[in-house]
Regions:
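Helix-start (N-cap) detector for alpha-helical repeat units in TPR-like alpha-solenoids
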Residues: 9, 46-47, 80-81, 114-115
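Structured alpha/beta or helical-core interaction and ligand-binding surfaces enriched in interleaved
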Residues: 117-374
């Protein structure tokens, strides 16, 4: 349909997009619906349905969000942004097959669509497509999974073994992928539990209050003495079965003047975190000397900076900072404003597939570039 004479409609669409950036989601949705009532031809513009779909997606109204994105595609079958958004939406569900399929469609329409490419790479850490649905990205992922470690994980790992493995992976990737840039800098392996950190931090930054969930979020923090030991920890998290039952990640922490090479294991109780700390020390004694730091902590750095008492951890919970009861009201306000039904959406968590992936390699490559190695 020709929309070239829809000047008023596109001006109004720009106002809706601006509202999406500045105002609450529910106010933006009301504004968008009222706009369509005043200017019915907005219904003929795919970008209108796409922005409404994004609002509904963030409000966790997935059913209406899907309908909105599908309307955009019906109006313009080559509207790649709507396919991408459907890929993001289904990633938030258990249907990774649909997520992969929609992202694949977005890339087929726009070959240089890097956002879709990067999300597709991430999905391949959790999902293996059938051969008939493979594409050049999944083919690279399969090839890198076939690169042998040539490492004995029952004894100490040398720096040279890590270097050799990374170089072998890079040879495989460079044969098939020109652009090694990637939008992630942490290797995050998940298991069953969605920590929902995005919601919790949004509440903290809006209200200066720590959500209830975070008072029961504990972690074992491992600080490696150098970059190569961080790489070793990444492979150990993948290969040692004990760690597979936990959410865990590897990262370079840049909050201080010098880089800190961190590996984190997330735990669900005070008792569990101390158990995991002790077991982790036993396991890692095979690979590292006593200089490695292994410590139990609670919550995120941002919370502890604002409330120093929060980070203090003791074996008796009664000695630790408790959550002020009035902070629960802030959570209720946030969920009321940011979800369709006013209730927290914890979403789903996908189990990471064991083994290296293109996602992991590209994060490591970002680390190497950051450390100016090779």
């Amino acid at each position: 349909m020709n929309t070239s004479n829809y000047k008023d409609e596109f001006n109004q669409l720009n106002k809706i997009v601006k509202s999406y950036s500045l105002n609450s989601l529910k106010d933006t949705l009301l504004f968008a619906n009222n706009s369509k009532f005043k200017l019915p031809n907005l219904n003929n513009i795919p970008q209108y349905h796409n922005i409404v779909g994004l609002v509904n997606f963030r409000l966790n109204d997935l059913e209406n969000s899907i309908l909105d994105f599908e309307k955009a595609i019906n109006l313009d079958p080559n509207f790649y942004s709507a396919y991408y958004n459907l890929g993001l939406l289904f990633f938030k569900t258990k249907d990774l097959k649909k997520s992969y399929s929609f992202l694949n469609k977005a890339i087929n329409i726009k070959n240089d669509y890097k956002l879709a490419r990067d999300k597709l790479i991430e999905i391949l850490s959790f999902y293996e497509p059938e051969d008939e649905n493979s594409n050049f990205i999944s083919d690279i992922d399969k090839k890198i999974k076939q690169v042998p470690y040539e490492i004995d994980f029952s004894k100490e790992i040398t720096d040279q073994q890590i270097i050799n493995y990374f170089k072998n992976c890079k040879k495989v990737v460079l044969k098939n992928l020109e652009d090694l840039s990637y939008n992630k800098v942490q290797i995050y392996r998940t298991k069953s539990i969605n920590l929902n950190c995005e919601r919790h931090k949004a509440i903290f930054f809006e209200y200066n209050s720590i959500p209830k969930y975070c008072f029961e979020c504990y972690k074992v923090v491992i600080e490696s003495k150098n970059f190569y030991d961080l790489l070793k920890m990444s492979l150990i998290f993948d290969q040692i079965t004990y760690f597979h039952k936990f959410n865990r990640k590897n990262m370079i922490d840049k909050k201080s003047e010098t880089d800190v090479f961190k590996s984190i294991i997330y735990c669900q109780s005070l008792e569990e975190v101390f158990q995991v700390e002790n077991e982790t020390k036993k396991i890692l004694s095979i690979y590292f000397d006593e200089q490695i730091s292994i410590e139990s902590k609670r919550g995120c750095h941002e919370y502890a900076s604002k409330y120093p008492e929060y980070k203090k951890i003791f074996k008796k919970k009664s000695e630790m900072m408790l959550m002020p009861s009035e902070w629960l009201d802030n959570e209720k306000k946030y969920d009321l404003e940011n979800t369709k039904d006013g209730f927290e959406n914890s979403g789903v968590s996908h189990d990471t597939i064991k083994g290296i992936s293109l996602n992991n390699f590209l994060v490591m490559n970002n680390w190497f570039n950051n450390q100016k190695i090779f």
